Design a protein with these regions (language model features):
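Residues that flank catalytic or metal-binding motifs in active/ligand-binding sites
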Residues: 87, 102, 128-132, 172-175, ...
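A conserved glycine-rich beta-strand in the N-terminal activation segment of trypsin-fold
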Residues: 59-94, 127, 223
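Conserved catalytic-core segment of clan PA serine endopeptidases
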Residues: 31, 99-163, 183-192
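C-terminal subregion of chymotrypsin/trypsin-like serine protease catalytic domains
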Residues: 13-52, 85-97, 192-211, 215-276
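A short alpha-helix/helix-coil micro-patch that ends at or immediately precedes a cysteine
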Residues: 90-100, 140, 174-176, 180
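Flexible, gly/ser-rich surface segments that form the specificity/activation loops bordering the active-site cleft
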Residues: 162-209, 217-218
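Single-pass alpha-helical membrane anchors
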Residues: 1-15
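A structural motif
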Residues: 51, 85, 91, 132-136, ...
């Protein structure tokens, strides 16, 4: 069977409905269908050095989502580090990563497999966080996705979420299934379990079928993105800072928008049932 036809059939099977009545239940249903397809976690099956380019892995278990806005590589980092498009001209990075002298090259691969090379001309830090914003030398190609963030009222759609305090600090407890990348561009599963002072904490997934797709973070994974699924869309939550922890991008939304000079794109949760 033609590969494109097969992918179309699988995509229809996975994303038959854009949303379900319950957001978290819909995520788990989609994960189950995706995991039935494959256990291969690699976004790319191979790469070439001259000319530099990556081949998308058609057997990746999460290949039905759009990963084209995640950097395939950064020149001068030896394979570590990562970045994600938050506008046509800006990339979310981790501030503590020792990026090369500016300008340096960053690479993206669209869904058909074409590699695009851009230069990061400057990096702005969000004060008091590990968030950095890289500016590209030109607008990213329209075939590369710019990721959205959650709306401000996202918590109203999460069953069982609680808000408390510990030593005067607000602590949000929840179970939110997420997908994330590591330095080898492999797709893993996990659960956000706490939000404390603008930092999200990730643990192995409680959802049993997803546990086989979990991999603990390591040094070198910093800057690679963490997403939550909203229907057929990956929505950006942040980028790795340290093992199991990353800055919650919504906490610093205003500061990020001031740097990029525009509003971040916001995902639509209105089709889901509010539970709070």
């Amino acid at each position: 069977m033609n590969v494109l036809i097969l992918l179309g059939i699988v995509s229809l099977f996975i994303f038959g409905r854009k949303v379900s009545s319950n957001w978290i239940t819909g995520i788990k249903d989609t994960l189950n269908k995706m995991m039935d397809f494959s256990t291969d976690r690699r976004l790319f099956s191979s790469w070439t050095a001259n000319p530099i380019g990556w081949t998308r892995n058609t057997q990746c278990w999460a290949r039905a989502y759009n990963w084209s806005g995640t950097a395939a590589g950064i020149m001068g980092l030896g394979g570590v580090g990562g970045g994600s498009l938050i506008s046509r001209r800006h990339v979310l990075l981790a501030d503590h990563v020792p990026y090369p002298a500016r300008p340096f090259e960053i690479f993206f691969v669209n869904r058909p497999g074409k590699t695009f090379t851009y230069k990061v001309t400057k990096i702005d830090s969000v004060p008091g966080t590990d968030i950095a914003i890289g500016t590209l030398d030109q607008d990213a190609d329209p075939s590369l996705v710019t990721y959205r963030v959650l709306p401000n009222d996202w918590a109203r759609y999460v069953q069982g979420l609680t808000i408390g305090t510990a030593m005067g600090i607000e602590v949000v407890t929840l179970r939110l299934p997420v997908l994330y990348l590591n330095q080898e561009k492999m797709v893993s599963t996990g659960d956000i379990v706490r939000l404390v002072s603008g930092a999200a904490q990730v643990e192995p997934p409680a959802f049993a079928p997803a546990q086989a797709y979990y991999q603990v973070q390591r040094g070198g994974d910093s800057g690679n993105p963490i997403f939550v699924q909203v229907g057929d869309e990956l929505v950006l939550l942040g980028a790795w800072h340290q093992i199991g922890v990353f800055p919650w991008i919504l906490t610093h939304k205003g500061a990020i928008e001031a740097i990029i000079g525009q509003k971040l794109l916001v995902a639509d949760l209105s089709g889901f049932t509010r539970v709070a």
